[in-house]
Design a protein with these regions (language model features):
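Charged, flexible cofactor/metal-binding loops and thiol motifs
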Residues: 9-12, 19, 255-376, 605-701
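P-loop NTP-binding/switch modules centered on Walker-like glycine-rich loops
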Residues: 60, 74, 198, 202-283, ...
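Helix-to-loop junction immediately C-terminal to a conserved catalytic motif
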Residues: 73, 77, 427
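ABC ATPase NBD coupling module
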Residues: 94-111, 137, 258-263, 295-301, ...
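Conserved ABC ATPase "signature" region
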Residues: 144-163, 272, 495-512, 621-622
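Conserved ABC ATPase signature
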Residues: 167-172, 176, 517-521, 525
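A short, proline-enriched helix->beta-strand linker immediately N-terminal to the Walker B motif
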Residues: 187-191, 536-540
C-alpha cells in the first residue's frame, strides 16, 4: 500500500470536496430499465477521490462496481440512467456536459483500463496506430503522436518498443497487451484513471509487474486511480482508501489499513474471512463463506439490505435501515452502515455447506476407492512437442511425477509453463512424445482418450476454468448431469434419477435449479453443475484447471470447501492448476512448479511455501499479493519475458531471468534435482543450505 491518506480525509463526507479533487460523487442513484420498470442498481452513493490518490472499490459481482465506473464515464447502456446525484471530474459536472465537452473530457481528463485487454485492443490495427490515436485525441499531431507513443511504450516498461509498435495485439502476451492499454489510457495524462479488474487472469509475476507499473506512473504523473477489483489483497497493496459496495450501496469506507485490519461491517468481515490467506490449509480449517445471495436488482428491502445474509442481524436490522455511522480510526474516519458496527468483528465464523457424513453419492462408498496414499496416477519422463510451421515447440520436457489416492497436486507456473498441456496429456486429450509413460493404478494408460476403456475414461475427468464454455446453454441442468450419468455410469430411468438427486445434493446444488438453463445460473452455481458432471462416474482423478479464477471470493470459498469435502468423502485425487498461489496452498498436499515445460521444484505444500525454494518459486511467491504478508525487503522482479519454447535457453531454462544465477554453470549445464528433505526436491545448481541462507536474508532489490 502507498501509505495512509491524510487524517483530514473524513470518510463519506463530500462536503469538503474541492475542485482539484479528481472525482466527487454526491448522492448517486442509477437505475436500469428492465422488463418495463426502473430497477435501482446504485443507491445514494457519495465518495471522493483526491488528486493523486488511489481509491479501491470492492464487492461481489452484481454489487454495482462496474456500473459505478460506467456512470462516471457517462457510458451507461441505453437502459441505464442517472436518476439522482452528481458526478464531478476535476470539478466538471459530467451530467451537464454537452457532446463536444464530454468528448473532450474523455480525451483529456479521464481514462479507463478494462479487465480484458484483448477485447479493448483492435485486432486489425498495429499497436503504434492504436496508441497514437489516443495522443491525437488529446491534441497531438500525427508525427508527434508516434514519437510520444514510443516514449510511452518505454515508460510502461515494454521491452523492444520499436518492434512492439509494428506488432498486432494477438502477437503480444496478456501482460504486454495490458501494458499497451495502460499506455493508451495515460496518453492524455488524465486526472482520473479507472482500473476495472485490470489484473484478473494474469500470472502472479505479470500481475505484480502491472501493479508496480501503475504505482510508479501514479507517482510520476500524479494521476488519481479508482481501482475496481474483487481481489482484496490487490486493493490492500495499491489503495490508500477503500469503499465496500453491497447491492448498490456503499456499506463501509475508510483508510484501507483501517478497514482491512478492523472492519466495521459484517459484509466486509465476511469477505476478508473467505480468503485462503497464508498458513490456511484444507487439513486445518474450512474457509468461511457468506450464506445466501445478493438481492435482485431493484429489490425493495425494508431495513438493512444485508440483513438476510448477516449472522448479527436482529429485528431492528430488518426493520430500520442503518444510517452511515462515522467512527474515528487510526488513519482517519471510517464509515459503516451497520447498527452494530462495534460488534462486526464478533461475527460468528461460518463455514456453510458443512460436509455431511455420507461417504458417496450412492448408498455405499465408491467401489473403486483405494487405501489412502495408494499410488493412483504416475507420469514418467513425459514430454510433448508441438510442430508449428516447421518449428518444434517443446511444451512439456521430461516431467516425472505421481499422484496418490485422496491427494491434491498443485501445478503452478506462468502462462506457457506447460501446466495445462501436462494435464491434457494425463487426460488423453493430447498424445505425448515417444518414451513418455503414463500409468493408472499401476497399469499402462493409453495415450489417447479414444483408445482408453470406459473405466479409464471415467476415472479421469476435468473441471474447466469457464463453465460457460463447458456446458451446453440450451440444456437444462438435469439433462446435463443426466447425460453424464448415462455416459459415465450407464444409468437410466429411476436409477439415474436416484443417483442424480444424490449427486446434486453432494455438490450442494438446490433442486429448484434442475429445470433451469445454465444461462440462468450464477457463476458459482454453473461451476457446481460442472463439478457434478465430473463426479458422475465416480472418478479417481479430477483435473481442476483454474476452477475458481473467475469467481468472487465468497463463491470461491464455497467451491474450495466443496472440493475438499468431496475429496474427504470419496478419496478423489486432484490435479489443481491455478495462478492464485494462496488458493493452491490451501487445497494442495503437494505442489509442482513448472517453467518452460520443465519441472523445477516439487514437494509438500508447506515445504514449497516455507522454503528453501527454487529461485523461480521464490519470485512467484514474492509477487503474490497477500493481506497478511509480512514485508521482507523488495519484491523480486524477473527481467524480460518467458523465452520461446521453440528456442529454450541452454543449461538451466531459468538462467536468463534468474536473479540468483551463479554464472557459466547455470548457462551451460542442466541442473540436477537436489534433495531438501521429506520429498521436497529442487532443480538448481545452488546447494540447499546456500539457498536457505540467501532466501532468509533481507532483500534490497
Amino acid at each position: 500500500m502507498n501509505g495512509p491518506p491524510p487524517a483530514s480525509f473524513p470518510a463519506f463526507d463530500v462536503s469538503k470536496s474541492e475542485r482539484t479533487d479528481a472525482l466527487t460523487v454526491v448522492g448517486l442513484t442509477v437505475t436500469y430499465r428492465i422488463r418495463g420498470r426502473d430497477r435501482e442498481v446504485l443507491h445514494d452513493i457519495s465518495l471522493r477521490v483526491r488528486r493523486g490518490e488511489a481509491y479501491g472499490l470492492v464487492g461481489e459481482s452484481g454489487c454495482g462496481k462496474s456500473t459505478m465506473a460506467m456512470a462516471t464515464l457517462r457510458y451507461l447502456p441505453r437502459n441505464g440512467k442517472v436518476k439522482a446525484g452528481k458526478i464531478l471530474i476535476a470539478g466538471q459536472d459530467v451530467q451537464a456536459l454537452d457532446a463536444d465537452a464530454l468528448r473532450t473530457m474523455r480525451a483529456t481528463a479521464i481514462s479507463m483500463v478494462y479487465q480484458d485487454p484483448g477485447r479493448a485492443l483492435n485486432p486489425s490495427m498495429t499497436i503504434a496506430r492504436q496508441v497514437a490515436e489516443a495522443f491525437e485525441a488529446a491534441g497531438a499531431t500525427r508525427s508527434d503522436a508516434l514519437t510520444r507513443t514510443l516514449e510511452m511504450l518505454r515508460r510502461v516498461r515494454i521491452a523492444a518498443p520499436e518492434r512492439v509498435m509494428d506488432s498486432y495485439p494477438h502477437q503480444l502476451s496478456g501482460g504486454m497487451q495490458q501494458r499497451v492499454v495502460i499506455a493508451m489510457a495515460l496518453a492524455s495524462n488524465p486526472a482520473l484513471l479507472i482500473l476495472d479488474e485490470p489484473t484478473t487472469g494474469l500470472d502472479a509475476t505479470v500481475e505484480a509487474e502491472v501493479l508496480d507499473l501503475v504505482a510508479q506512473l501514479r507517482k510520476e504523473l500524479g494521476t488519481a486511480v479508482l481501482f475496481i477489483s474483487h481481489n482484496l489483497a490487490v486493493i490492500g497493496r495499491m489503495c490508500e482508501r477503500v469503499g465496500v459496495l453491497y447491492a448498490g450501496k456503499l456499506v463501509e469506507e475508510g483508510a484501507t489499513q483501517d478497514v482491512f485490519a478492523r472492519p466495521r461491517h459484517p459484509y466486509t468481515v465476511g469477505l476478508l474471512r473467505c480468503l485462503p490467506t497464508s498458513g490456511r490449509s484444507k487439513t486445518l480449517e474450512r474457509l468461511d463463506t457468506i450464506a445466501g445471495q445478493l438481492p435482485a436488482p431493484g429489490s425493495i428491502t425494508q431495513g438493512c439490505i444485508y440483513a438476510d445474509r448477516c449472522r448479527l442481524a436482529d429485528d431492528r436490522c430488518r426493520r430500520d435501515a442503518p444510517p452511515p455511522h462515522r467512527v474515528a480510526a487510526a488513519h482517519g474516519d471510517q464509515m459503516s452502515r451497520c447498527h452494530y458496527h462495534e460488534r462486526a468483528m464478533e461475527l460468528p465464523r461460518a463455514t456453510a455447506d458443512t460436509p455431511s457424513p455420507r461417504a458417496s453419492v450412492g448408498d455405499a462408498a465408491p467401489a473403486q476407492a483405494a487405501a489412502p496414499g495408494t499410488l493412483v496416477l504416475r507420469a514418467e519422463r513425459v514430454s510433448k512437442t508441438f510442430h508449428v510451421s516447421g518449428v518444434a515447440l517443446k511444451a512439456v520436457d521430461d516431467v516425472s511425477l505421481d499422484l496418490a489416492t485422496g491427494e491434491t497436486l498443485g501445478l503452478v507456473g506462468e502462462s506457457g509453463s506447460g501446466k495445462t498441456t501436462l494435464a491434457k496429456l494425463m487426460l488423453g486429450l493430447l498424445s505425448p512424445d515417444a518414451g513418455s509413460i503414463l500409468e493408472l493404478d499401476g497399469m499402462p494408460l493409453p495415450a489417447r482418450v479414444t483408445r482408453r476403456n470406459d473405466e479409464q475414461v471415467k476415472s479421469l475427468q476435468i473441471v474447466f476454468q469457464n463453465p460457460d464454455s463447458a456446458l451446453n446453454r440450451s440444456h437444462s441442468v438435469k439433462r446435463l448431469i443426466g447425460r453424464a450419468l448415462s455416459r459415465l455410469a450407464a444409468l437410466r430411468g429411476a436409477a439415474q434419477d436416484e443417483r442424480l438427486a444424490a449427486l446434486t445434493a453432494a455438490v450442494r446444488l438446490p433442486n429448484r435449479y434442475l429445470g433451469a438453463r445454465t444461462r440462468q445460473l450464477s457463476g458459482g452455481l454453473k461451476q457446481r453443475v460442472a463439478i457434478a458432471r465430473a463426479f458422475a462416474g465416480e472418478p479417481r482423478v479430477v483435473v481442476c484447471d483454474e476452477p475458481t479464477s473467475a469467481l468472487d471470493v465468497s463463491v470461491q470459498a464455497s467451491i474450495l470447501n466443496l472440493l475438499a469435502d468431496l475429496q474427504r468423502e470419496r478419496g478423489t485425487s486432484y490435479v489443481f492448476i491455478s495462478h492464485d498461489l494462496h488458493v493452491v496452498r490451501y487445497l494442495s498436499d503437494r505442489i509442482a512448479v513448472l517453467y518452460l515445460g520443465r519441472l523445477l521444484e516439487i514437494g509438500p505444500a508447506a515445504a514449497v511455501f516455507d522454503g528453501p525454494h527454487h529461485p523461480y518459486t521464490e519470485a512467484l511467491l514474492s509477487s503474490a499479493p497477500a493481506l497478511d504478508a509480512a514485508p521482507h525487503g523488495e519484491r523480486i522482479r524477473l527481467s524480460g519475458e518467458v523465452p520461446s519454447a521453440a528456442a529454450p535457453p541452454s543449461g538451466c531454462v531459468f538462467h536468463t531471468r534468474c536473479p540468483r544465477k551463479l554464472g557459466a554453470v547455470c548457462e551451460q549445464q542442466d541442473p540436477p534435482f537436489i534433495d531438501a528433505g521429506d520429498g521436497h526436491r529442487i532443480r538448481c545448481h545452488i546447494p540447499i543450505q546456500d539457498l536457505r541462507t540467501l532466501q532468509c536474508a533481507p532483500r534490497n532489490a
